[in-house]
Amino acid sequence: VTSWSLCTPGCTSPGGGSNCSFCC
């Protein structure tokens, strides 16, 4: 599992990284 800290808060912004959709 990748680090969740790579994702944006709430996964609303694409700038959080490629893992954003994974965390959602």
From Swiss-Prot:
The modification (E)-2,3-didehydrobutyrine is found at T2. There is a cross-link at T8-C11 (Beta-methyllanthionine (Thr-Cys)). The modification 2,3-didehydroalanine (Ser) is found at S5. The modification 3,4-dihydroxyproline is found at P14. The modification 4-hydroxyproline is found at P14. Maturation of lantibiotics involves the enzymatic conversion of Thr, and Ser into dehydrated AA and the formation of thioether bonds with cysteine. The C-terminal lanthionine undergoes decarboxylation. This is followed by membrane translocation and cleavage of the modified precursor. There is a cross-link at S21-C24 (S-(2-aminovinyl)-D-cysteine (Ser-Cys)). The keyword Oxidoreductase does not apply. The keyword S-adenosyl-L-methionine does not apply. GO terms for biological process: defense response to bacterium; killing of cells of another organism. GO terms for molecular function: signaling receptor binding. There is a cross-link at S3-C7, S13-C20, S18-C23 (Lanthionine (Ser-Cys)). The modification 6'-chlorotryptophan is found at W4. Keywords: Antibiotic, Antimicrobial, Bacteriocin, D-amino acid, Hydroxylation, Lantibiotic, Thioether bond. Belongs to the type A lantibiotic family. Lanthionine-containing peptide antibiotic (lantibiotic) active on Gram-positive bacteria. The bactericidal activity of lantibiotics is based on depolarization of energized bacterial cytoplasmic membranes, initiated by the formation of aqueous transmembrane pores. This is Lantibiotic 107891. The lineage of its organism: Bacteria, Bacillati, Actinomycetota, Actinomycetes, Streptosporangiales.
